């Protein structure tokens, strides 16, 4: 059997990924789908950390645009990610995968507090960890949380799931059919062109800490497994094409 290309990954999923075709809430079918996708790589002995967004439950920017205090809205978004984390934890545990939900905001009755060494130890023991509540601070996105946690737990790569898009394009392919998809792009070029990889703060952090990012379509079954086994899927964003 082939050996995995990556041994420790961080998977970034948007909250909308769990909503399926709905605009809000959690679709049980999507929970089962992502649990199966994670299980496929877990079987290879790959250590998996997951960071979830909360946009299926709370759209913070829309609330801010209507006048809500920004910090208040951001904290509500953090709570939304915890709901998503508990739902995914349940879906994974029903498949027999030991899973720990860890939160950047303490709520001991619900999940473990995020402690870097404890998170790393869970990974070493073969447990999937779901890292919720972003960074625990307002004004930072879950993209920034993914970058920060990837650095802290020494993930080899961030798998950046983008619903409906199979990589990084020169322009929005849904609006510009002739947009070019990149097989590889450097951090600096992605930043200078303002391309949609992750927010600029998170992307700069990944560049400074040399954390490669693979942007891919998670709705193609088996894509996560293909990536960890070394197949080229989506777009690699890094300092060098062979990273």
UniProtKB/Swiss-Prot annotation:
Pfam families: AA_kinase (PF00696)
UniProt-recorded Gene Ontology molecular function terms: ATP binding; UMP kinase activity
Keyword tags: ATP-binding, Cytoplasm, Kinase, Nucleotide-binding, Pyrimidine biosynthesis, Transferase
Binding residue positions for UMP: 54, 135-142
EC number in record: 2.7.4.22
Catalysed reactions, as listed in the record: UMP + ATP = UDP + ADP
UniProt: ATP binding residues: 12-15, 55, 59, 163, 169, 172
Activity regulation comment: Inhibited by UTP.
EC top class, as a word: transferase
PANTHER family found in the cross-reference section: URIDYLATE KINASE (PTHR42833), URIDYLATE KINASE PUMPKIN, CHLOROPLASTIC (PTHR42833:SF4)
Family statement: Belongs to the UMP kinase family.
Purpose of the protein: Catalyzes the reversible phosphorylation of UMP to UDP.
Name under which the protein is recorded: Uridylate kinase
Lineage: Bacteria, Bacillati, Chloroflexota, Chloroflexia, Chloroflexales
Encoding gene per record: pyrH
């Amino acid at each position: 059997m082939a050996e995995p290309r990556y041994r420790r990954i961080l998977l970034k999923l948007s909250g909308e990924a769990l909503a399926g075709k709905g605009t809000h809430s959690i679709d049980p079918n999507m929970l089962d789908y992502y649990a199966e996708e994670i299980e496929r790589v877990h079987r290879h002995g790959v250590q998996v950390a997951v960071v979830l967004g909360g946009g299926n439950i709370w759209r913070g920017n829309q609330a801010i645009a209507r006048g809500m205090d920004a910090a208040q809205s951001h904290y509500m978004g953090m709570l939304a990610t915890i709901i998503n984390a508990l739902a995914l934890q349940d879906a994974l545990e029903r498949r027999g995968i030991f899973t720990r939900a860890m939160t950047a905001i303490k709520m001991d009755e619900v999940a473990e507090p995020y402690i870097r060494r404890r998170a790393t130890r869970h990974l070493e023991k073969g447990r999937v960890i779901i890292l919720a509540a972003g960074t625990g601070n307002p004004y930072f996105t879950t993209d920034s949380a993914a970058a920060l946690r990837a650095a802290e737990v020494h993930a080899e790569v961030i798998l950046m799931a983008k619903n409906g898009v199979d990589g990084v394009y020169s322009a929005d392919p849904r609006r510009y059919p002739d947009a070019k998809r990149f097989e590889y792009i450097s951090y600096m070029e992605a930043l200078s062109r303002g391309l949609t990889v992750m927010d600029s703060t998170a992307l700069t952090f990944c560049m400074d800490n040399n954390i490669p990012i693979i942007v891919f379509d998670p709705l193609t079954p088996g894509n996560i497994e293909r990536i960890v086994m070394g197949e080229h899927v989506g777009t690699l964003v890094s300092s060098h094409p062979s990273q």
